[in-house]
From Swiss-Prot:
InterPro entries: G-protein_beta_WD-40_rep, N2O_reductase_N, WD40/YVTN_repeat-like_dom_sf, WD40_repeat_CS, WD40_repeat_dom_sf, WD40_rpt. It is found in: Cell membrane; Cytoplasm, Cytoskeleton; Nucleus. This is WD repeat-containing protein 1-A. Keywords: Actin-binding, Cell membrane, Cytoplasm, Cytoskeleton, Membrane, Nucleus, Repeat, WD repeat. The lineage of its organism: Eukaryota, Metazoa, Chordata, Craniata, Vertebrata. One of its GO terms (molecular function) is actin filament binding. It comes from the Eukaryota. Belongs to the WD repeat AIP1 family.
Length: 607
């Protein structure tokens, strides 16, 4: 293969305030599961930089769970589709697909022999279904709740018991198979968010929005006690997870804490305070082997440290909203990837290890649309919050003084030499020097969309929605129209100069990439055809002979300058999502980002 996937830096879980997030464990103890958008993410628990992404759902995926055998995963989405797929092959072949009810699936449970599945959620006619995994034949009827069911679990030892937790403040207890309703447990005074049997099946825990955790006998359903007396947490409890030996319980709450409970002593052994911001609310947890994980409303996954509750062992960060732009900094022999997302977050990633963090302080408040680096260790970004920001790559801290307010919304930014920056806004081109606006062109007869600056000559190329590239030159503190336009094949979406400044590549809405030769007075060198939909982004390889383009057709092409017919086609680089930005780490490594909030690296080999 001329290309192969080298690394995946996965997205964080997609979070919603007041809604529990299920982190599902792996019976073999190696991985954990969660969902974001239409994707199911499988991450290695020892090294979270190792990730695999399943993207076959047509609607937003909500929950995924391993079968106890470890060979299959069942995942459910907002439309009520349940897909059961293989975990042993990279292709993740579909085994079975069912539609237990029409509506969002909120939780899934398997019997220990991996033969029966219970599915619960927000159905229209019914809220739950339990059936054989291979035929879909019913193995009972789940009744006893009159509102949306949030959680389900099946005792992993015989005789089987099934329990559900619902918005009607009740848990329903069923025996089977075939599963039949026995009684309701109505101890909670608010919604029941989570129900879980202990690994040996002897105990059952239920957690609710009333801040209480009740323990029951796993076989009979008799109430044993209320953990912590009247209240286990000051806020609603969204998840509980048992220790492997069943003696302790981990709970996650909206009061921004997680707790470890000694079940026999009925007391909290450890309390983890995870912050004071609303984004620090804890909406999910998982206890797997020696690892204790919790997930915050921000999407961050915390590895909790029993020996030091005040500070997590590590926090997995990243994006959980679509990534809009990216740039790469190669210095000191290391590559750092900078990414900006739809919610205003900017992250920096070590390209080798995947270690990443976000800039500190108060930054952009809306989508980061474009970014570029200057030679002074600064990242220049423009955003839909109508600002342009200069952020130090050394301090990695936003500073209020480094923000420049624009008159109208900026779309794209380019950095030249000598402290010059050009940004194109709606109906306006602005020149900045040393972090100050020095010149603007307002009376344009076209709508500017993209900009690039020739580092050597200072020529500014502005791509317009009129299907032309307009050339300007920086003269002192002003921009002079050169009176020259270059014809693209459609409305320009992106443009980039090669690193040696010899060529200008232009992508357009008519699916074409056009390359102009700078030395020959910007004469057209070649046109490159292949995209089936609007081309979006273009990036030059450091060898100046190859360049990559991405489009709305979800394709990435790597083109050869001297031969338009020699191309490498990369379909489904980010399946179901178009690639929003590209950048080369070196001559053979291409990085891509997309609306799936993931960063991928590809090894590209040329003949």
């Amino acid at each position: 293969m001329p290309y192969e996937l080298k690394k995946v830096f996965a997205s964080l879980p997609q979070m919603e305030r007041g809604v529990a997030k299920i982190l599902a464990g792996d019976p073999k103890g190696n991985n954990f599961l969660y969902t974001n958008g239409k994707s199911v993410i499988i991450r290695n628990i020892d090294n979270p930089a190792i990730a695999d992404i399943y993207t076959e759902h047509a609607h937003q995926a909500v929950v995924a769970r391993y079968a106890p055998s470890g060979f299959y995963i069942a995942s459910g989405d907002t439309s009520g589709k349940l897909r059961i797929w293989d975990t042993t092959q990279k292709e993740h072949l579909l085994k079975y697909e069912y539609q237990p009810f029409a509506g969002k699936i909120k939780d899934i449970a398997w019997t220990e022999d991996s033969k029966r599945i219970a599915v619960v959620g927000e159905g229209r006619e019914k809220f739950a279904s339990v059936f054989l995994w291979d035929t879909g034949s019913s193995v009972g009827e789940i009744t006893g709740n009159i509102k949306v069911i949030n959680s389900v679990d099946i005792k992993q030892t015989r005789p089987y018991r099934l329990v559900t937790g619902s918005d009607d403040n009740c848990c329903a207890f069923l025996e089977g198979p075939p599963f039949k309703f026995k009684f309701t447990m109505s101890d909670h005074s608010r919604f029941v968010n989570c129900v879980r049997f202990s690994p040996d099946g002897s105990k059952l825990a239920s957690a609710g929005a009333d801040g209480q955790i009740f323990l029951y006998d796993g076989k009979t359903g008799e109430k044993v006690c209320s953990l912590g007396g009247s209240k286990a947490h000051d806020g609603g409890i969204y998840a509980v997870s048992w220790s492997p030996d069943g003696t302790q319980l981990l709970s996650a709450s909206g009061d921004k804490t997680t707790k470890i409970w000694d079940v026999a002593a009925n007391s909290a052994v450890t309390t983890f305070n995870l912050g004071s911001d609303v984004l620090d609310q804890q909406l999910g947890c998982l206890w797997q082997k020696d690892y204790l994980l919790s997930v915050s409303l921000s999407g961050y996954i915390n590895y909790l440290d029993k020996n030091n509750p005040a500070r997590p062992l590590r926090v997995i960060k990243g994006h959980n909203k679509s990534i809009q732009c990216m740039t790469v900094n190669n210095s000191d022999g290391r590559s750092t990837i900078y990414t900006g997302s739809h919610d205003g977050h900017i992250n920096y990633w070590d390209a080798e290890t995947g270690e990443n963090d976000t800039f500190t302080g108060k930054g952009h408040t809306n989508q980061v649309s474009s970014m570029d680096l200057d030679g002074c260790n600064q990242l220049i970004t423009c955003s839909m919050d109508d600002t342009l920001r200069y952020t130090s790559l050394i301090s990695k801290d936003y500073s209020s003084s480094e923000s420049v307010k624009m008159d109208v919304q900026p779309k794209c930014v380019a950095v030249g030499s000598g402290g010059y920056v050009v940004t194109v806004c709606i109906g306006q081109i602005v020149l900045l020097k040393d972090k100050k606006k020095v010149f603007a062109i307002d009376s344009l007869d076209y709508e500017p969309e993209a900009v690039a600056i020739h580092k050597g000559s200072g020529t500014v190329a502005v791509g317009g929605a009129d299907g032309k590239v307009h050339l300007y030159s920086i003269q002192g503190n002003s921009l002079k129209d050169e009176g020259k336009t270059l014809p693209a094949k459609g409305a320009v979406t992106d443009l980039a100069y090669s690193h040696d400044g010899a060529f200008l590549a232009v992508t357009d809405a008519n699916k074409v990439v056009t390359v102009f030769s700078v030395a020959d007075g910007y004469s057209e060198k070649n046109s490159y055809y292949g995209h089936h939909a609007k081309a979006l982004s273009v990036a030059w390889s450091p060898d100046n002979e190859h360049f990559a383009s991405s489009g709305m057709d979800m394709m990435v092409y790597v083109w050869t300058l001297s031969d338009p017919d020699t191309r490498i086609k990369m379909p489904d680089a980010h399946r179901l999502h178009h690639v929003s930005s590209l950048a080369w780490l070196d001559e053979h490594t291409l990085a891509t980002v997309s609306h799936d909030a993931c960063v991928k690296q590809w090894t590209v080999t040329f003949k």
